[in-house]
Structure formats: C-alpha cells, structure tokens
Amino acid sequence: MSYIRSSIFVLIGASCMILSQSCSTCSRQQTLENIVVDLDLADLAADSVYVNMGREVLYALPNPIKVSMLIKKWGVGFQSALLHDPAKASGYLTKKNMAVNFGIYITDLTTAGLYEQTQTVLRYKQALQQLVEGLGLQAAVDQKMMKQLEDNINNRNEMLRIISETYSSCTAFLQAEDRHLYALAMLSGGWIEGMYIAASTIDQKSENLLKQLIADNKPTFDLLWQALSDLDNVPEDAVILLSQMSDLATLMNVATDNATPEMTAKVKNQILLLRSNFIKE
C-alpha cells in the first residue's frame, strides 16, 4: 500500500447516517449518546467521497459504540457470557493476534461501559493495557488516558468518548508507523466482535433484525475488506484471516442481493466462525 492519509481512521459518513436514522425514535439523551464520539456527521459524509483504495485511502472505523447502542436499543440486558474473557489477553503472543483481540476487547469494553458494568470495565481496561504494551502502543495510549477512563467510570458518556478516542488513536498510530496489517487486524476484530454480539443477541429477537443488521453494516465492511485486499506482502499468519474475511465478503454480497433466511444464516455462521478463530490463543 503506497500511501495512506494520516490520521483518517474515522467513521464512514454512510454508517453515521444509518446510526442517526436508527435512533430517530430514541430519547434526546440516547441521541446524545449516539454521537458521544463528538464528530461532525456532515463533515464525515463529505469526507467519504474521497474513498480510494489505490493511492489514497479513507478507512472506515467500525465503531464499537454503534453496534453496542443498537443492541441496547433492542431492550436486551447485559450478557457477559457473550464477551471474550479478559483473562486470556496474556495468551496472545503474535502481533497479529494481539491486534485482532485489541479490537475485540475494546468492543467488549464499550458494551460493558454502555451497560454501566463498572467492575467489568476495569477488567477489560487491564486486558487492553497488556495488549497496548505488547503492540508497543504506549505512545498512542498513555497512562493519563487510562487514568481518565478509570476516573470517569461512573460518567458513561465521557467514558465512551475516551474509549472511542483510544480506539482511533491506536489505529492511527499503527497506520502512521506503516503497520497497516495490525491496524486493519484491530479494526477487523472490533467489527467482528460487534457483529458477533449483535447476531447472537438476535436469537432472542426477530430474524428480520439480522437482515437489517447485515444491510446496515455492509458499507463499513466493504471498505474494511477492500483495504485488507489492498495489503501488500501479507505475512503467513495473516493469510488465513484474509481468506476467512474473503469468504465473509462473498456471503455478505450474496445476502445483500438475496436476503433469504438461509443466506443470512450463512453470514451469521461465518461471523461466528471468524470470531471463534480470532480468539484462539
């Protein structure tokens, strides 16, 4: 990949608009929570026209807050069993696995924070600190930021803002260091974990929600997959990741054009498979 615009790991405008529309019936407070990342939706929508996977790239940041807010809107209570065990953070030894699970853990941290599960938040904060050190991200996430997270543990909106800032700081830092694979692995882990939690939750709701979930999140996935496809000199330990993401891309395309229960079930199963493989030590 010859060039990537610096510091542009941001939400794609289209997904922001989907989020905004999905919460049109929410209370004013919920709407404020949806934009807690403090980004201007109009500016993001304008920036999205610059997407180009050749010489200049605008990455979509699959924001953990988006899917977590959606799940909470469905009226589903906190389900800790769906989250990845933070105690396993020390078991990831390769940079690729650390990056993928950083994305997974920060999504779980977001979910716990949204449901105001303070002790769970602290456990995921500790897991992230281990991965920050393993990935050499101390310059992107300093102790001050981690302390701010802990100090604001009872201030949900501020805590979610700090989490979002941490996520974007880490991916931008990796991008600036020309560690594109790890930045994309982090984004992939976050996207898959959010979809995994949402898809698993849908078992308790309506099959139509699964179709809508896939359709609403396809724009960000398409950009993520295109960026992954554009990687040069992919190391051996990432080949399987790309292959499985390729399978998901194929299924997502078919499910969008032919949203039968069978096809949406295949997409869900591929997401579950990817998540299972991602968390293996």
Residue ranges of predicted features:
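N-terminal Sec/ER secretory leader and immediately downstream segment
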Residues: Q30-M145
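A cross-kingdom marker for long, charged
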Residues: Q226-E281
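Generic structural concept
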Residues: G103, K125, Q129, S164-Y167, ...
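Secondary-structure edge/capping motif, primarily at the C-terminal ends of alpha-helices
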Residues: L109-E116, L135, A139, L174-E177, ...
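C-terminal motif of bacterial Sec signal peptides marking the signal peptidase cleavage site
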Residues: I18-T25
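Non-transmembrane, amphipathic alpha-helical segments
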Residues: S90-N97, L109-E116, T120, Q148-D151, ...
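Extended amphipathic alpha-helical interaction segments
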Residues: E150-L231
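Bacterial N-terminal signal peptides that target proteins for export
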Residues: M1-V10
